[in-house]
Structure formats: structure tokens, C-alpha cells
Amino acid sequence: MAAIKALQEWCRQQCEGYRDVSITNMTTSFRDGLAFCAILHRHRPDLINFNALRKENIYENNKLAFQVAEEQLGIPALLDAEDMVALKIPDRLSILTYVSQYYNYFHGRSPIGGMAGMKRPSSDSTEELSGKKKVPSQPAKLSSPVPTQRLPLSPARTNPVVQRNEGVSERPSPKAAPGTVGSSVSSICGVCGKHVHLVQRHLADGRLYHRSCFRCKQCSSTLHSGAYRATGEPGVFVCTHHSSEAVSVSPKLSNLASRQPGGGIADTRPIGVSQKVLETNGEATPLRARTAAWEHAGGNRAAKGFVQTELTPPATSRVHVGSPAGPRLPMSTVTTTSANSKATTHVTNSSPVGWSSSAQSSTGTSGSRPVVSPSALGAHLSVPQGQAASKGVKTQLNSSTDSSSTAPTPAWTSSSSRTQQAREKFFHNLSPAPAPAPASSSSSHASRVPTVVTAPSGKVSPLVNTSTSKVPSATVVTVPTSKASTVVTAPTSKAPTVVTVPISKAPTVVTAPTSKVSTVVTVPTSKASTVVTAPTSKASTVVTVPTGRGHVVVNTSASKVSGVVDNPAQESSREQALSVLRKALPGLTRAGSQAPSRSSPATSSVLITLPKNEVPPKVPSAKLSHSTTQAFSPTPKMEPTAPLSVGSTSWTSVSLQAGKKSPGISPGIGKTSAVSRPQAEVKGTSGPGPTSQEGQEEGPEGWRARLKPVDKSIPSARALEQKEPVLAEPRAGDTPRKASSSSDSSIHITLTPIQQKRTPCLADSGSSLAAPSPPSRRKKLVVPPTLDVSADWLQPELKKQDDQTRSCKEKTATWGTRESSAILDNDLVSPDEAVTSPVRLHPNYISQEELQRQLQDIERQLDALELRGVELEKRLRAAEGDASEDGLMVDWFRLIHEKQLLLRRESELMYKSKDQCLEERQLDLQGELRRLMEKPEGLKSPQDRKREQELLNQYVNTVNDRSDIVDNLDEDRLREQEEDQMLESMIQNLGLQRKKSKSFLSKIWSSKSKSGQT
């Protein structure tokens, strides 16, 4: 009781002379708030105008005192103005603890909350103040002024008996359940919603928190005094080192997440519509902005934005092919433009891999195809899915291309001149030397699919099925025949290879319906200006071979066995030529028979395959590869390549030169015929060959002469096959191809038009490695046929080039690293320099790791003290008015003192950390400022002068901040010493009085016992 009376006496002395202030106890005497204001005015008259205060304004008086003490003196508000209004008898222990902070501060700084890191708002709104004025003093009619909590009133507020017995406003008594009875709004944590005891209290921004709950919003670490700041959101605090941008975004994200039941943002996309579709539509609006559009569009949104298809698109219109039911494929647009920008083809494809023909036709796009019976295969113009008609043939297509292929288009009249005119106009709009483009297809359903020949164009990618997603574009022109329809595709400038028309249910591209098949082959070369096709009879074959100077159209006719190009050669001559080839190339016969659908000529070649009833002799191909499932891609500098192969079980090939005239082709009739165009990829070089003006040699010597350049480039092609995965990797359009084995046999005939002064480079057009010179390479390739040419003879050169490239990259990386390090050295301080800096060499320097460790130790000690304080608080409230209260109060003050010591140490560490940062900042500013000042005035630019002034201002502010920290630390030490002395003396006096009382009672009892004995 002595300590409580001493504190009460101190308060009475401080409030002496102030009107309407009378300190008779430590409960009701402080209810109106004038006593708190009087103590503050006594020591700091500049903070409060006491004459303006009125006794009846309980809320305003208490609010003013608590606010000024917290903001100006750093004393945390353990009390709340609302509780002072609501309760007739305030909590005695809370008032004792709070007033003791006043006493400690004015005798030496030591508030429970430590430093005043966060300040409460300067004033609340006028509406809240007016509401507080109208609050009656009757506790039964009082409601909480804080609308967000909406907690029920405690019995301490409504029950006068509880008020009288407990005297509690914000603390529950041991006789009542904690957190329910005696709890008020001010005793509830703003984070966890649980009751806050006196020793745990931490008020920030007008809200009460557990010290352990008061954490950073960003890093979730406990906020220390002076090391946190408020944000725009109420009750949200962050560490001082966090950026303001990240803080401002986090509340919005949390609000968005809180709107959904699971804490996440619900997906507002329509059912069945993927996010990829939304992205391909080009919608840049956020998800919430798109919600309204989805509500109006409903399920048709995908059809409106994703598939843009017309029922009757013109031949030159931009065709969008796709379906909303497709499994999440983005819409891709292929735009091909010729060199003179006259012929342009737009193709848009979004069909996924594996779509069936029925699915394509059901989309209502231009991907539908006519169904033609085997008996009446008319010549139709059909635009497959992913293809668009070229503008160059608009006049020839007329109205037949206007339909979207729900019904087949009418057949053309068989007119080769008409086709010739269309081709001339088309190739006139294209570049004069289009690069080669291979084509590929498989054969099946021979009775329902026509034979198709595709012409190459530009940069190529392998021909894929119409049911695949990568569909190239070309112009498709058909020519009627008697028994089978033939489709000829014209090339575009830089478009991928062409997909043929899907007929009936055949998943493959091209087949021949019967053994009596008419075939139209169009093979343009790099300088070809015209392509002419002509209708044929039952078993006739028309092959058009444009050369550098023109084109040759040859009609051949045979019964069921042969089809001949141009002038028919004797059968004996053909056999002699084949025997010469076998003798000249003995080592390649096996490879040619095992690898039918690969071709890698040194120059551009055309591989034409016709069916044959019986298996021909194994003739080695000059440029056949080992697999039909891999693809190469030629360079743009090479000649156009259009290899055509008939799917069969056995394959042979004959390489011919088409630079002179069209040679003979081995005839044959097969069950089915498929058109495939293996991609040729050449690594070697080819020297000048015969020009197109030379006459054709029909004998075996001419064949051998024409085959020599091809023979020389064989090792390079074989070596290229070993490097195929690396060279063919950049081409995403390359797809595996397999030849169908529906026919008995077939034969490959390669037409190789050779032009002078052609030097092909590496197959990879994007490669930066240059090929060796043609003469030296040609000399290396002249080797005996019996010599075993290793497939990896080019590897040393490639390794050397790879090493050069790797070393160049390493040098670049090293240079970039050195440059980066140089930049860092100019702008930042390296770790070695930071260690040797004067700040870190200071004997009192504390590293950040050590600071964090000490702060964690203080945190643990504070947690232990809070547990002790909670138990001691319960005992104090239970022993109110008892003889043991005095001893418990002494323990309480000691516990508060220990907590104050820990908070002091925490404040010192925070001061120390801030001071070290300022010192390092000061050194940096000083160095930069000296460099600017050492520069002559005549050489200084306006930017230098401006920067110098800014640095000078920053330097002065830094020095002032450091001085303030030192002054605050000195003042704190002095106040702490005085406080410790006052507290120790008070405790000692309390202990002496207790000892005296005990000794006095013992003397009385001892005297009584002595008198009784006598």
C-alpha cells in the first residue's frame, strides 16, 4: 500500500491548484480526464491548454491526454477514452500502471511501450466527437462507439454489482472468464481478437495489439519501436525499409481474394473457354472488365471473337480457319508476300492436331471438302483447311472459289492455255527465283482420293495432313481427266508447303484411284515463269518441266506398263543406263533401296515417282537418305525441289539432269500412288554444271556425265544425315513423314536442273557458319567408288567451327562480366571494400547479423516477462484491498522495470542500426561531394552544380540526424539513471516499511508471550 499511496501523493501534488481536480483515490479521481491533463500541463504547459477544458467533457479530456502523452512523450495509452466514459469506476490497476508511466517519464524516460514509434491520429472526425459527447454516463444505455467490432457489452459495463466488486473496465477479474466478463473494446487485439493484458498492450494508430501480433504486413516480422511506419490502410504497418509501392498493392490483393469463398479470385471465364482463347482474341482488358462482355455474349463469345468465317469468302479474301470447339489452340496467321509485294496470301489456322474430316466440315469454315465418287472424279477447285487462294489467280478462279465448300464447285473446262495464262500471271507476281519447298503426303483410300502434285515455294516446311495444326498455304488449281482428277498447286513467295484437298474420309493427302491413272506433274525451277498442265487419257502421263529458259510439256502414252517423258527412249538404253549407274555407284544400291523417301541433292532436284507392277532392279539413288520419318529443309539459295514419290514397299531412284531436256522416266502402273516431297538439305557445294541450252545426250555416256556432279556430292549428303538433328532443329514446320506400302513397287526419278554460279550454303539459313569454297570441296569429293568414305569426315571441320563459336561466346561472356564488374565498381562498393570501411572498423560497430541476434534475444525475454505479467496481473486483481496487495504491487513494478530495461535495449539497438546506416551514408556523400568540389568551376556543368547542391543538403541532413540520435541516447541514459534510482528508492522504502511493520508486530507478540509466561 505504501507504493500506491506514494504514487497517489505524487499525483495530488502535481494536480494541486488546478480547478475541478481532486485526487482522493486512484480510480474515480481520474475518470473525467482532468487529472491526466493537469499532470501533463504541470510539466509541459505548451502541450495542453488547461483553461479550455471542461469537467463534463469526459471523452474529450481523456482523449486529449492520451493522445498528447503518446504522440509527444512516447507514453503508450494503456487506457481508452471510451472505457473512461462507459465505466463509473475505472480500472484501478490500469490507472496505477498508466500514471506510473507519467511519473517515470518526468523523473526519467521509461514508458512501457518503449519508443513512440507510431503516432495516433491527431484528431478524429467531428461526427465521432459529437457522438461521444452525447453518450450518457448510464452504463446500461451505453453502446460501443466503434462500429467495426460490434462486441456485446460486458457485465462490467452493465452490472453495477460487477462494477463495484471488480472495478474493471478493460480487464477481467479472476472470478470471471477472461475475454468475456470485464472485457471492453480497448482490451481486444486488433489482429487476433483476443483479450490483451496490461503487460502485453501495444497501441498503434488508435488500435490495441498484442506485442507479438504487431507484425509487418510484408515480411511478417515483429515490428520494433521506431522501425515501422503506417500505410494507407488502417491497422496495416510495415517495416521502414519496405517500399511503399509493394505496400499499396497488398491491401487490394487481399480485398480481391477475400471476396471469394475460398479466399481466391473466382474464374469468370465461360465454361469450356480456355485462357489461351482469351489471350488469342487480343483482349487486353482485365478479368473483371471482361466479365460483363462474357455475360452479354454468353456461349457465343468464342464463335464471335475466335472464329471469323464467312460462308462465301472470295478467292482473295483472308480466310480464318478455326473452331470454338478446338482444344485450346491459338489462332495463327500465315501471311506470305512475294518479292514485289503484289501477290499476297493470308492463311489463318487454328485447327488442332488430330481433327477428323467430319469435325472440320462441321465447323462451317472453308475446311470442308467435297465428296467425290471413284466413278466420277470431276476436276474441282477446293480450298483445304488452312489454305487461301492467291490473289495472282483471281481472274482464273472466277466464281468457283467463292463457295466455302459446303458444296463442291463446278468443274473447269480442260484448257491448257487457260492454265498457262493463270500460271504466267501468278509467277509474274512472284519473285523470279523462288526457293525450293518439299512436299510430303501419304497414300490411302486409292479409290476415293485423286493424285495431287504440289509445287514448292519460298522458305519451306514439310507438308502435313489437313487435320494437323500447321497448315501451309498455296493456290490450288485442278485439271479434269477421264478417269481421275488431278490437282496442281501453284507456289507462293514465302509460304509453307501446300496441303492437298482432303477427299472423303481419307486422312492422307494424295492417292491415285485406279491403276489406269492420269498424272499431271508441275515442276517449276528457280527461273520458271510458266507452268502448263494438260488433260490426258486413261493411261497417259503429262510432265511439265520448266527449265531456266522455258518449259517443256511432253505427253506420253502407254498401255498399262510405261509412261515416258518427252521423246521415248529405247528399253535397251534404259537398261544400259541402269547398269552404268549400278557400276558407277555400287556402294549406294543398298542405301537407296532402304531409304526411299529422303533426297539430299547437291542442287535442286525433282523426284517423280510412278507406280510399277513388277519390282525394278535396285538402282542407287544419288541423294537418297536412310529414313522416311525425318525431314530436311533446303536453303533459300537452292533450286526449287519437288520430289514426288509413290508409296510402295520397294523403292529405287534415278538421278537425271533437267538442265538440257526432259529425260525418260521409268514407266509403271501401281495400285495406288501417293505424292510425297522429302525435304532436301545439302551441306556440300556443287560447281557449275551444264547449262540449259546444251543438247541432251541420250546415250549412257550422257547419263554418266550428268550423274558425275551428283556423285561428287554424295559424301557431303551422307555426312549431313549424321548432323540432321542439329541442322533440322530450328525448323518447327518439319514433321515426320511415312510412305504408305499400299502398292507393290515404285521408282524414284530425280530431275536435277543445274545452273552455273550457284553456291549453296549450309542448310540452316540462320547459321552464321560459312561453307568452304566450291572448287576445293569438289576436289575432295572426287574419290574412287571403292573408297570407303566415312560419314563423319566433316566432323573435324565442324568441331573446329564449333570451337571457334564457343570461344567467341566465351569471350563475349567474359567481356560482359568484366564490363558489369567495372560498372559495379564505379557505382557500388564491393564487399571487400565494405569490410574495410571506417564504419565497420569502429570498435563499437555492430553487424546486422549481431543486431538481429540481439533483437531476437530481447524478443524471447519479453515473451517470458509477458507470461509472468499476465499471472501477476490476475493475482493483483484478486488481492485488491488485501494485505498481500502491497507485495504484489512491488513485484509488479519490478516486472514493469525489467520490461522497460529490455525495451530500452531494443531502442538502443534500433538507434545504433540507424546511426551506422547514416554514418555509411555520410561517408558516401562525403566522397562524392569531394570529387565534385575538386572539379574546377569552369569545367562544371549545370548538372554538376545542381548535383553538388543536392549532395550538400543531404550531407547536412545526415549529420543532423546523427546528432539527434546521439542526443536522444544521452538523454535516455540520464533519464534511465534517474528513473532507476527513483524506482529503487521507492521499492526500498516499501520494503523497509514492510520490515518495520513485521518487526513491530513481532515485538508485540513477543511481549505478550513473555507476560503470559510470567
UniProtKB/Swiss-Prot annotation:
It comes from the Eukaryota. Residues 356-368, 399-419, 438-447 have a biased composition (Low complexity). InterPro entries: bMERB_dom, CH_dom, CH_dom_sf, F-actin_Monoox_Mical, Znf_LIM. The modification Phosphoserine is found at S110, S144, S154, S250, S773, S837. Residues 1-261 are annotated as: Forms an intramolecular interaction with the C-terminal coiled coil domain keeping the protein in a closed conformation. Residues 114-181, 311-450, 609-780 are annotated as: Disordered. This is MICAL-like protein 2. It comes from Rattus norvegicus. The lineage of its organism: Eukaryota, Metazoa, Chordata, Craniata, Vertebrata. The gene is Micall2.
